[in-house]
Each structure stands twice: as C-alpha cells, then as structure tokens.
Amino acid sequence: MTTLRSAVAKVSETWKMKIAQRSFFEKTIKDFNFNTGYYNQIGLRWHDIMPRNAVVEEAFRRLPREEREDMDFRLARATLLSANKTILSKEEWTKQEEDVPYLDPYIKLIERELRNKADWDNFISPRTYP
C-alpha cells in the first residue's frame, strides 16, 4: 500500500509541476474551463465525478480509507449544495492545484492486472499442443 501512496504523492507533485509549466494561452483557457465548471464550485474533484466503469469502480474500492472518507464527505456536501441550489464561497472552491488525479495510479495498476489476466487466460502451453 505504501507504493501506491507514494505513487499518488508523485502524481500530485507532477500535476502541480504540469500546471506551473503551462503557456499563458493554455493557462488562460484551462483556467476558464476549470472555473466555469460546476463541480469545483461545490467542492468536488474531477475523479469524484468521472464516468464510472468496472476499472474505475475497482479503483474506488481500493482507495485507502481516509481518501474514501474524504471523497464521501465531498460527495455528501456537493449533494446538499446542489439540492439547495447554492455553491460554496469562492475561497472554498476546489483549486486546480488541489484537483489532483488521485485515482490514476490505481487505474493504471488495475488495467495492468487486467492485461496480465487476459494474457494468462489466452495462454496456450506448448506442452499441451505439440
């Protein structure tokens, strides 16, 4: 589990570096796109609302308990805000630096496991068929 946590920390650092290295034009467009998105105004991150499939569901299942509790809190708060048709104050919005793709290491690991499983499922031993 420590390797996945270190991978998440590494993704977080590379994400911050990637944001810092954007050109002015790219930064302006990405900032506009991010700030007009509704999910950050109610305190969510992109991976909280990303489209679900089997791989993403498994990645959510493998999250550490603290991260799952944080995500559950963000979703509950966002549901309440959405039901009340309100948004958070500007200071509480999710910032781009905080919107870290925290599921990426888990998704990559699961996809690699599925590829390995498919390889072994389709494996034909040379001893079986001479």
From Swiss-Prot:
<keyword id="KW-0496">Mitochondrion</keyword>
<keyword id="KW-0813">Transport</keyword>
<protein>
    <recommendedName>
        <fullName>Cytochrome b-c1 complex subunit 7</fullName>
    </recommendedName>
</protein>
<dbReference type="InterPro" id="IPR003197">
    <property type="entry name" value="QCR7"/>
</dbReference>
<dbReference type="Pfam" id="PF02271">
    <property type="entry name" value="UCR_14kD"/>
</dbReference>
<dbReference type="InterPro" id="IPR036544">
    <property type="entry name" value="QCR7_sf"/>
</dbReference>
<comment type="subunit">
    <text>Component of the ubiquinol-cytochrome c oxidoreductase (cytochrome b-c1 complex, complex III, CIII), a multisubunit enzyme composed of 3 respiratory subunits cytochrome b, cytochrome c1 and Rieske protein, 2 core protein subunits, and additional low-molecular weight protein subunits. The complex exists as an obligatory dimer and forms supercomplexes (SCs) in the inner mitochondrial membrane with cytochrome c oxidase (complex IV, CIV).</text>
</comment>
<keyword id="KW-0679">Respiratory chain</keyword>
<dbReference type="GO" id="GO:0005743">
    <property type="term" value="C:mitochondrial inner membrane"/>
</dbReference>
<comment type="function">
    <text>Component of the ubiquinol-cytochrome c oxidoreductase, a multisubunit transmembrane complex that is part of the mitochondrial electron transport chain which drives oxidative phosphorylation.</text>
</comment>
<comment type="similarity">
    <text>Belongs to the UQCRB/QCR7 family.</text>
</comment>
<keyword id="KW-0249">Electron transport</keyword>
<dbReference type="GO" id="GO:0006122">
    <property type="term" value="P:mitochondrial electron transport, ubiquinol to cytochrome c"/>
</dbReference>
<keyword id="KW-0472">Membrane</keyword>
<dbReference type="GO" id="GO:0045275">
    <property type="term" value="C:respiratory chain complex III"/>
</dbReference>
<keyword id="KW-0999">Mitochondrion inner membrane</keyword>
